[in-house]
Amino acid sequence: LEEQGKRVRASEAVFDHEARKVTWTERDPNQSQPPRTSALAFSEPIQDILTVIYFLRTQKLEVGKSFDVPVSDAGRVYRFSVAVVERKDLNTVLGRVNAVRIDPALFGEDGLVRARGALSIWITEDSRRLPVKAQLKVDLGTFDIKLKRVSYPEGKPSR
């Protein structure tokens, strides 16, 4: 459920990877109007805004390289570039870790977010590939995000 002032919307994306189709449904729970639905076909693997974080963790991240990622959101497909910017030692809740910084180009006129801004995400270079830090810069200000805790199911190793 997304609320922006008086505007409220509930949205859902259903991915059918066998049929290579995504169906997007959006409705206002405060209105009796039928939901707005759109469907589109895709020809390559595609992510939504949440699974893209997992997808980025599975990629080979070499400093100086970049790659494109297709993402479906709000009934459209966006392609954005991800630059692998730097390698850095960070102090984190996990202790001192080697991490790589990626900068997904989400912002801009044709971007997923039609505003000025920048996002950086640091992912550990160990086998866990955990996102331990992020920084979001927008007109409103700069937001620093840090991983606070990691928990594993019983019986799973922590490293």
Language-model-detected regions and their locations in the chain:
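Acidic, serine/threonine-rich low-complexity disordered tracts
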Residues: 1-19, 58-159
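Contiguous hydrophobic, core-forming segments of folded domains
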Residues: 1-63
